[in-house]
């Protein structure tokens, strides 16, 4: 089973994982800013874009076979869970870990800020009815109505959406995160309703060796709403 990759530019390899409901096309607006310095490798996660459904172990093996020996890895939202798991399990391959409005655990519990699982279920139900309309409304909300021409090339499969929902609801790396010793940064948006800024305060206490960046006027998509700040942060972090 092949994993679909798109490559742009030359330089240090930078692998990008998209979020739930999207595919690697979500990164297209920032590629011109990144490709002068990096070899950008855009990945379609299982069940999204042109990558078929597969379990984690199959995904990891197939992906690592297609990637350079060492690379920086960035994941947005659900993609951050994939990126974190890969960094935990393959520390010799991942040189830098960048988590963009992501969390080691998305669902809230008594001592962890997050979102109620019903939020994702409602989003899933809306996606199942009208994918294009739901994603465009989601983007508009996160960008505070800023214009963004997003074209969905390959809608996610129902299986991909359901599998992603399961990942968001069950994957929990809060304990394993303590194993990570590579340079790691977490980016938060103060207006983000999905990864609340309260998460940042708890993570700063529990994982003091990581770097944390807060985008004061951003919501869940700072790489699109505040691209210049995002690119500056990436260039400062990846040496």
From Swiss-Prot:
Gene3D superfamilies: alpha/beta hydrolase
Binding residues annotated for substrate, in chain numbering: 20, 77-78, 138-142, 220
Keyword ATP-binding: no
GO molecular function annotation: pimelyl-[acyl-carrier protein] methyl ester esterase activity
Annotated GO CC locations: cytoplasm; membrane
Enzyme class, broadest EC rank: hydrolase
HAMAP family: Carboxylester
SUBUNIT field: Monomer.
Protein name, as recorded: Pimeloyl-[acyl-carrier protein] methyl ester esterase
Gene from which the chain derives: bioH
């Amino acid at each position: 089973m092949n994993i679909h990759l798109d490559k742009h530019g030359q330089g240090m390899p930078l692998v990008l994982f998209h979020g739930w409901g999207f595919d690697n096309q979500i990164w297209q607006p920032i590629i011109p800013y990144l490709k002068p310095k990096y070899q950008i490798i855009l990945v379609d996660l299982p069940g999204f874009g042109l990558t078929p459904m597969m379990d984690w172990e199959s995904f990891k093996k197939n992906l690592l076979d297609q990637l350079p020996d060492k690379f920086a890895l960035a994941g947005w939202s659900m993609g951050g869970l994939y990126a974190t798991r890969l960094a935990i399990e393959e520390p010799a391959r991942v040189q830098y870990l960048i988590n963009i409005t992501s969390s080691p655990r998305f669902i809230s519990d008594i001592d962890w800020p997050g979102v109620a699982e019903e939020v994702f279920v409602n989003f899933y139900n809306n996606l199942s009815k009208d994918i294009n309309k739901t994603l465009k409304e989601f983007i508009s909300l996160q960008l505070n109505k800023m214009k963004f021409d997003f074209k969905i090339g390959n809608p996610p499969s129902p299986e991909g959406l359901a599998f992603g929902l399961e990942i968001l609801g069950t994957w929990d790396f809060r304990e394993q995160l303590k194993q990570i010793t590579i340079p790691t940064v977490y980016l938060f948006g103060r207006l983000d309703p999905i990864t609340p800024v309260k998460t940042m305060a708890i993570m700063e206490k529990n994982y003091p060796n990581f770097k944390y960046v807060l985008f004061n006027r951003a919501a869940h998509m700072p790489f699109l709403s505040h691209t210049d700040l995002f690119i500056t942060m990436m260039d400062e972090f990846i040496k």
